[in-house]
Amino acid sequence: GALGLSFSRSLLRDARLRRISFRRHHLEGVDFSGADLVGCDFREAVLTECSLRGANLTDARFEDADLREADLGALKLADASRFRGAAISRRQAAELLSGLGLKVM
């Protein structure tokens, strides 16, 4: 990345990582649970076995990211625009819709 850092297999729970660019990076096994990711750029990134559960995603960008193997936690409909064009799995789609009160059959 711009900082020349690698975060693979890293525990970054509750870390303050505002406005860092992870654009086009492949992040593997990174736990961002509860992290402050305000303004971070994950566009076109691949998140494999990563967790975003409970992270602050205000102004974060995920357009065209591959999130199929990431734990997204409970996303809100208001967050949906941040994920435009991102790839998610059928399971994740069902979880998102279920969180909105819809029954996925």
Model-derived regions, located:
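Tandem repeat scaffolds
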Residues: 1-105
